[in-house]
From Swiss-Prot:
Residues 45-173 form the MATH domain. The gene is bath-42. It comes from Caenorhabditis elegans. Residues 219-287 form the BTB domain. GO terms for cellular component: cytoplasm; nucleus. GO terms for biological process: proteasome-mediated ubiquitin-dependent protein catabolic process; protein ubiquitination; regulation of proteolysis. Pfam families: BTB, MATH_2. This is BTB and MATH domain-containing protein 42. Pathway: Protein modification; protein ubiquitination.
Amino acid sequence: MSSRSSWSSTEQINRTISSRADDLPPQPRRLEVVSKQATRVTALSTKLEWKIEQFEKLMKLIKNGSNLISRMFSVPDAPTVCWELHVYPNGKRDEDVNNVSFFLRQVGLARGEEPIMTEFQIYALDANNQRVSVCRDTKDFTNQQGRGKFQVSRDKMLGALRSDGTLFLICEVEYFPPGSKISVEPVVDEDVSTEEQEEMPEVIVRANNRSMWEDELFTDCVIHVGNKHIKAHRCILGQNSPVFKSMFSSPNMIEAQKGEIHIEDAKYDSVRAMVEFMYTGATESLESQGNIDEILAIADKYEVLMLKDQCERLIAQTINLKNVTQIAMFSDTYTADYLKSAVIRFLTTHHRVVIKTQDWISLKKSRHELANELLEAVLSTDQDDDDVTSNIPISVSPPPARKRLRRSAK
């Protein structure tokens, strides 16, 4: 009886609650507005792969304090930030003997710019393609500053060598470019495909500009170089070159009246490369053209500064003991500041050898002010830098030969 009574009471309570709920007025529907947002953060990353042959012998035979320097590596999206890896096979200082010292060096920013907080790791791949860690760290970098020192024992490095005695080094660097901003943006509609999202608008614009130029669509001016010509658009030339803009803006100049430009002090290929850059922001196979110095000269004349900057960086990668003096004069002739800074960095390590060469002796006689400027800069860097290289450096794989640079433009 008690069980049936309990069930009846519960049923009655449920009915009462249901009845009261039915008696309540309908509740207003809640209007919910969702703002979908995303914080987009794009870090840049670059990677160096560097093979150093006969590294076991280098650890035994190289004097303490002598170093190897990699070629500069960077990201095209941030050309003002470049990196070098420095390796001392027998340690940097006296107390580092029997160790290998490693430094990562940032060589692109101008003096006074904000430091770049950077995450990086350096490791080797041994004979079994297994990683042998050198370091993993996060540090802030300013211009010309090497960060480290990271010490690895000689025994550990011996175990990191490939079967042929080669050291296969890898350096991975990740950072935010100078001036980067973190922004909050609306979320892209999920119905839009990933492929469409990744289709960068600027890529489409560049492709359209190239087609317009190559198809000579609505061109309104022509550039004469020798017996060849290049058709173009005044608006594109004027937008990218203050010199062309001045020509087309002056009604008394023949360029403005007839839309014809005659260039007699440059080669056709160099002028065409400059015009191509104005339309697309790039020049196909710039590194393989073999006339980077001529392209820089014409870019300097017509003040196409972004192209000039790219040429400076490419030439900087070719500096060696044989051409450093010529490149120094070239950089001074065309006020190529980045290239001159690269010369100074090279001299900081190599000055003891360079100042004994016949080219340097000739430079002191013909352009002594430039020679003094370079040496003063080397001394200044030597005092300010916390990673100063010293003694005679070793070049494991010398840069490829390139043609002699012109000393001046005609």
